[in-house]
Amino acid sequence: MSDRAQQGDRVSREGMPPVVILCGGRGTRLREHTQAIPKPLVEIGGMPIVWHVIQLYAVQGFERFLLATGYKGESIVRFAAETPWPENVDVRCVDTGLDTPTGGRIKLLGPRLAGEPFCATYADGVASIDLSKLLAFHTGHSRLATMTVVRPELQFGVTELDPADGRVLGFREKPRSEHWINGGFFCFEPGVLDYLEHDSVLERDPLERLARGGELRAHRHEDFWECMDTYKDAVALNDLWESGEAPWRLW
């Protein structure tokens, strides 16, 4: 593993919890960009999406960030070292392996978290989320893990039908899903690391085991949320930014 410019084996306990940002994936569904650069460096409004994620946390009082890198990680290290961060914001990169799954990446960061609670999220998702409310919800329920859940917009509009005769009653343009999905923006107690192995996919066995044991709670986020999975998503997020009405821009 390799830290970026500011050295130190541990992130000490000062104020808000540290934030782990998962930056290691290959981003294959966004290959128009990711053949040349890692997905976290795909730009929105001229700045990498991971910069937007860090800003979202930093403007709400978080200061310590660990970027778990993998694919083309050297580019992320260079970005972190060369970016002028807000005062008191400390951004470090840790090489967690080329193809290490999400849970394994967090497991590898365990020694650097100094046995304290921490937040975690993905490098490709932005939201108009109040992180102080998320943190208060997490500390209030006294369980090991909190996962933010969202109801994304459906890809297509829907047609409303009369079930009796098939008569079309109306149309709705891209309504929100009726189902809640994982939106990232996690809060974890250090005990979560005991649920992780180096080959763990966070979203599968670890979260499922936490749920079965009653140790996972969901924080519902009803407002804007979007992840950048495809080229179309990247275009949509850039359009929002250029409109001056990007809902995640809280700074």
Residue ranges, per PLM feature:
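Conserved beta-strand termini and adjacent loop/short-helix elements that scaffold enzyme active sites
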Residues: 70, 94-96, 148, 219-221, ...
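Conserved N-terminal catalytic core of the sugar/cofactor nucleotidyltransferase
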Residues: 2-22, 29, 43, 47-122, ...
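Short beta-strand-to-loop element that shapes/binds the nucleotide-sugar donor at the catalytic cleft/hinge
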Residues: 71, 146-163
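Short alpha-helical oligomerization interface
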Residues: 35-40
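Residue-level signal for inorganic ion chemistry
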Residues: 50, 76, 109, 124, ...
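Catalytic-core segments of class I nucleotidyltransferases/pyrophosphorylases
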Residues: 117-119, 126, 132-139, 151-154, ...
